């Protein structure tokens, strides 16, 4: 085969430093748009972006020559710098979670990310994160999972 045709969908989640509410609600739509532009500039296909004041979800397709860790580093570093330029003392927590998404689940994962505000009226980030790890079969140590 002379060409590559990857379509690996990845749902990534990362939290703010110490899961503090560092992303003001009024700036969130601008941050999501900014992240979309950063992704586009690095040939990352960002399909969905959303979150709350203390964490972010992104659904993306990576270029075939980019490791996931590099994509996350690009998104986290650029968004941290941009939030700092907005006058916010900001940092992301170290690390991230990443989950593969089947094409058949694309619309439900997109809806899940779009509805973060409503979702978090019923469940906090810690509960959500643990549930995502369990649902995906990711082994974790409860003492260390959230830093």
Q: Which residues fall in each region the model found?
A:
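Basic nucleic-acid-binding interfaces
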Residues: 1-147
């Amino acid at each position: 085969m002379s060409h590559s045709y990857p379509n690996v969908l990845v749902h990534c989640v990362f939290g703010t430093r110490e899961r503090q509410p560092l992303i003001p609600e009024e700036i969130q739509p601008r941050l999501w748009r900014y992240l979309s532009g950063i992704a586009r500039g690095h040939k990352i296909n960002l399909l969905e972006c959303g979150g709350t004041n203390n964490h972010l979800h992104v659904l993306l397709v990576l270029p075939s020559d980019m490791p996931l860790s590099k994509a996350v580093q690009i998104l986290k570093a650029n968004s941290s710098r941009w939030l700092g330029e907005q006058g916010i003392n900001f940092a992301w927590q170290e690390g991230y979670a990443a989950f593969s998404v089947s094409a058949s689940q694309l619309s439900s994962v997109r809806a899940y990310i779009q509805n973060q505000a409503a979702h978090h009226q019923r469940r906090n980030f810690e509960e959500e994160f643990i549930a995502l790890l369990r649902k995906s079969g990711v082994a974790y140590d409860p003492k260390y999972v959230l830093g």
